[in-house]
């Protein structure tokens, strides 16, 4: 009985946290100056895309390791090569997710994200849609960047009961990722730590 009560409590608590945390984003998201103009641009672009391109826009591969013909074995993918650049150009992916293997140093990461975007926007098919460059930089034990500010994880932030601490942590992570050319962070998450 106690186990079911605890599960219900945790589910209710997580639902409440997610609802309350979404309220804080209302003030951050500004309305577009002209929503009709944005819709028109998107509709125009979509009308020119093939079905294959539309499907590819929903795909987000990772390139953690790569082995070119001249390599003796797989290596962490940290520097753009001709093979990956051609894949990005040919397939019109919607994004690429980066992991620790990709983001060792600040300068290296910025160069890689710049090269990925250049490959995505230099195609000859006319779509030239920039990539969503993503990562799951949550803080705590889920820390992908090889350099940057080490911040506490969600459990530690929650223990402080400080919305200011959580906000500051999110802002630091957001600024650092943006400076590296990463435009989506799959965080924070509503993980339940089942093995503390």
Model region roles, listed by residue range:
Residues 2-13:
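Bacterial N-terminal signal peptides that target proteins for export
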Residues 4-5, 17, 82-84:
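A generic local structural motif
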Residues 20-37:
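Sec-dependent signal peptide cleavage junction
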Residues 38-68, 89:
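Mature N-terminal segment immediately following signal peptide/propeptide cleavage
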Residues 64-78, 86-196:
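Enzymes and membrane/adaptor proteins characterized by extended Gly/Ser/Thr/Asp/Glu-rich
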């Amino acid at each position: 009985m106690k186990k079911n009560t605890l599960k219900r409590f945790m589910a209710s608590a997580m639902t409440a946290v997610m609802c309350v945390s979404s309220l804080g984003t209302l003030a951050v998201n500004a309305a577009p100056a002209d929503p009709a103009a944005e819709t028109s641009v998107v509709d125009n672009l979509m009308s020119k895309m093939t079905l294959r391109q539309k499907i590819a826009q929903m795909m987000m591969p990772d390139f953690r390791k790569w082995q070119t013909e001249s390599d003796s074995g797989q290596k962490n993918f940290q520097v753009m090569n001709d093979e990956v650049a051609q894949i990005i150009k040919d397939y019109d992916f919607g994004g690429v997710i980066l992991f620790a293997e990709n983001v060792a140093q600040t300068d290296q990461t910025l160069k890689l994200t710049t090269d990925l975007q250049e490959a995505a926007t230099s195609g000859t098919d006319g779509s030239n849609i920039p990539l969503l460059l993503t990562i799951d930089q949550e803080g705590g034990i889920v820390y992908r960047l090889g350099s940057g500010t080490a911040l506490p994880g969600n459990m530690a932030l929650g223990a402080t009961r400080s919305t200011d601490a959580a906000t500051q942590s999110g802002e630091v992570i957001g600024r650092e990722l943006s400076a590296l050319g990463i435009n989506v962070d799959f965080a924070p998450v509503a993980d339940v730590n089942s093995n503390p």
